[in-house]
């Protein structure tokens, strides 16, 4: 994955300040990625497909933009990747760019064990993690640029797919596969409904409660919990889902 990972850090000028052959120009910044891909492709052999998740934009000022990201994607094709998963964002700088919506701060801090971190994030969290509005298939416009530029291998679209109508649109636009996360967490049987219902749409309300608890306990939809949530969290979730 090139979404805030070690390879991502190496090929961004924002995080790569090296002065040697691994820094400076995009060609140099991609050198480490090339080395990793060479080893991965050698290890994979003919036994498995290698899919690489790569950014289209980082989503913050000074991060990688689409023109350079297309060049990175083309290099991954040259390096032997069998398919690319097109994403965006940078976990430490622009987490909601990839997730979209708002971060439920009360839910996030509810599961933190460290008291000073809990209260600190409650005080400044909304400024630390700014909201990025959600819309269905929010990465599609950028992904179409990659589809135009890259013809050699399959592309996997990910980002805000919650209905059969939009999934069909993405596939009709030339993407071989789609990837879903929160839609399936909300409704594990959603794929079965997609097969039989033309108007199928999952019931995810995009409160991001599942994301808020992901790093401290586990990832779960609030609609499928065995325990009852505190009233303050229920109100926070309801407010976000009704925005």
Regions found by a protein language model. Give the residues of each.
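Short, small-residue-biased leader/transition segments that mark boundaries at the very start
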Residues: 2-9
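Generic structural signal for well-ordered alpha-helices
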Residues: 33-41, 69-74, 140-147, 167, ...
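Glycine-rich tight-turn/loop motif centered on a GG-T
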Residues: 10-33, 61-67, 72, 98-136
């Amino acid at each position: 994955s090139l979404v805030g990972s070690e390879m991502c850090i190496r090929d961004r000028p924002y995080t790569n300040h090296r002065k040697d052959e691994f820094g400076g120009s995009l060609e140099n910044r991609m050198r480490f990625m090339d080395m990793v891909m060479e080893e991965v492709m050698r290890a994979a052999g003919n036994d498995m497909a290698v899919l690489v998740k790569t950014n289209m934009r980082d989503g913050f000022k000074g991060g990688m933009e689409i023109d350079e990201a297309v060049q990175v994607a083309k290099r991954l094709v040259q390096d032997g990747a069998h398919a690319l998963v097109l994403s965006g964002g940078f976990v430490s700088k622009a987490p909601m760019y990839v997730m979209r919506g708002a971060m439920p701060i009360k839910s996030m801090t509810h599961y933190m064990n460290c008291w000073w971190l809990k209260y600190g994030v409650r005080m400044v969290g909304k400024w630390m993690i700014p909201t990025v509005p959600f819309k269905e298939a929010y990465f599609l416009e950028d992904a179409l640029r990659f589809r135009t530029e890259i013809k050699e291998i399959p592309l996997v679209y990910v980002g805000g797919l919650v209905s059969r109508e939009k999934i069909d649109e993405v596939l009709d636009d030339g993407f071989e596969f789609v990837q879903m996360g929160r839609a399936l967490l909300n409704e594990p049987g959603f794929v079965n409904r997609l097969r039989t219902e033309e108007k199928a749409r999952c019931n995810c309300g995009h409160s991001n409660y599942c994301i808020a608890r992901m790093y401290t306990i586990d990832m779960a939809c609030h609609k499928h919990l065995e325990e009852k949530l505190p009233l303050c969290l229920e109100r926070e979730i309801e407010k976000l889902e009704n925005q």
